[in-house]
UniProtKB/Swiss-Prot annotation:
SUPFAM superfamilies: YozE-like
Protein family per UniProt: Belongs to the UPF0346 family.
Name of this protein: UPF0346 protein SPD_0837
Natural source organism: Streptococcus pneumoniae serotype 2 (strain D39 / NCTC 7466)
Entries under Pfam families matching the protein: YozE_SAM_like
NCBIfam families per the UniProt record, alphabetical: PRK13672.1
Lineage of the organism: Bacteria, Bacillati, Bacillota, Bacilli, Lactobacillales
Amino acid sequence: MRKSFYTWLMTERNPKSNSPKAILADLAFEEAAFPKHTDDFDEVSRFLEEHASFSFNLGDFDSIWQEYLEH
């Protein structure tokens, strides 16, 4: 079974980094409502588009998701 996207993303936290992946990891960590137990692209993407209290470049999200799938 694949790790949830959130669990995988948390391994990329680095407040000193300017990489999109580290930025998203830090934002997701601070977002209490972020979907933590899913590996479903649509669920995470929909959350980022409609419910997140922060904005994030969805093109960068697509690239990060692809890296998650290749992990």
